[in-house]
Swiss-Prot record:
Protein family according to the UniProt entry: Belongs to the ferredoxin--NADP reductase type 2 family.
Lineage top rank: taxon: Bacteria
Organism: Salinispora tropica (strain ATCC BAA-916 / DSM 44818 / JCM 13857 / NBRC 105044 / CNB-440)
Cofactor, free-text remark: Binds 1 FAD per subunit.
Name of the protein described by the UniProt record: Ferredoxin--NADP reductase
Binding site for FAD: D33, Q41, Y46, A86, F120, D278, S319
This protein's record includes keyword Transmembrane helix: no
Keyword Oxidoreductase: yes
GO molecular function, one term: ferredoxin-NADP+ reductase activity
InterPro entries: FAD/NAD-bd_sf, FAD/NAD-binding_dom, Fd--NADP_Rdtase_type_2, Ferredoxin-NADP_redctase_2
Assembly description: Homodimer.
The protein's required cofactors: FAD
Top-level EC class as recorded in UniProt: oxidoreductase
Catalytic reaction annotation: 2 reduced [2Fe-2S]-[ferredoxin] + NADP(+) + H(+) = 2 oxidized [2Fe-2S]-[ferredoxin] + NADPH
Length: 322
């Protein structure tokens, strides 16, 4: 059995900052995540990709951001329960008890759920499934592995354009294909790629891949036109992910689709259960890493008052510490 003041469910950026902030408030904290390493989707999907919208960093690699967050929390010795899924939520004497995979229990004063979008599965590129692992990938753990290759990126969101700008200096060629004329990606991200020697093909789909054991080419068909065969070594299918809340969906939390509804204190409908980061929903919600950091601090501060009603909601600035 484990016992802490705050149990953080999810070791992505918001969860790691929640761990720091709990320590800053003098609270003991445990971080639970089903993945074997901290960092959530950043570590799992794009550790080498540059992130441009974190305050104070013009650009920072995903793995470096995660390393900095872990280092920031380290002085407070958070307990990491990685490779461990939080399966159940119950209460004992009014306090939350998390049932962990494997049968262990984590007793705590409050829970802060920072599980991102839950567990995630890449949306498949139908014509490419037989090449998974031999030329079709859904994220790029090591961009250097694609040095000198002809790379085809499929998708129109931020991930597709981020991979295009990351891989362009390394690859022999980069082609980005999107089935629509308009993109979901941020306008600045699109403009950055258009300024690079990246071929962008719109209103088009990948209709066939060529190759024996590995991909050697791809047929691209523009709407109303003929197919064009491109030489391709690697296809990056950046088509987004389907999310699954997993056991969280059975905890009795109020949901808005796959998100947890919270109030201005980041409290959910369950006693002593708060949430922060991409998993939350409220009017005007914007899903950014930067937003998640503020929500994590709000959740922890309000949880601290629940644990000790005599405590101040605002503990002071970290710069006041000597």
């Amino acid at each position: 059995m484990h016992e802490v003041d705050i149990a953080v469910v999810g070791a992505g950026p918001a969860g790691l900052f929640a761990a720091y902030y709990a320590g800053f408030r003098g609270l003991s904290v445990a971080v639970v995540d089903a993945l074997p390493e901290p960092g959530g989707q950043i570590t799992a999907m794009y550790p080498e990709k540059l992130i441009h919208d974190v305050a104070g960093f013009p650009a920072i690699k995903g793995r470096d951001l995660v390393a900095n967050l872990v280092a920031q929390a380290a002085p407070f010795a958070p307990r990491y329960l990685l490779g461990t899924r939080a399966e159940k939520l119950s209460y004992a004497d009014g306090r939350p008890v998390l049932g962990l995979a494997g049968g262990e229990q984590l007793h705590c004063g409050a829970v802060v759920i920072t599980g991102g979008l839950g567990s995630f599965t890449p949306r498949p590129l139908p014509v490419a499934e037989r090449f998974v692992g031999t030329g079709i990938i859904y994220f790029v753990p090591q961009p250097a592995d694609l040095t000198g290759q002809d790379v085809l990126i499929v998708g129109g969101g931020d991930s597709a354009f981020d991979w295009a700008s990351t891989l362009q200096p390394l690859a022999r060629s980069v082609t980005l294909v999107h089935r629509r004329e308009k993109f979901r990606a941020h306008a600045a991200t699109v403009a950055r790629v258009h300024a690079l020697p990246v071929r962008v093909v719109v209103n088009a789909e990948v209709t066939r891949l060529h190759g024996g054991g590995a991909v050697t080419g791809a047929e691209i068909t523009v709407r109303g036109g003929a197919a064009e065969l491109l030489p391709v070594d690697t296809v990056v299918a950046a088509l987004g992910f389907t999310a699954d809340l997993g056991p969280l969906a059975e905890w009795g939390l109020r949901l808005d689709r796959r998100h947890l509804v919270v109030d201005s204190t980041m409290a959910t409908n369950l006693p002593r259960v708060f949430a922060a980061g991409d998993i939350t929903e409220y009017q005007g919600k914007v899903r950014l890493i930067a937003t998640g950091f503020g929500e994590a601090a709000t959740a922890v501060n309000n949880a601290a008052v629940v644990l000790d009603p005599a405590a101040h909601l605002f503990p002071g600035h970290s710069s006041d510490e000597t």
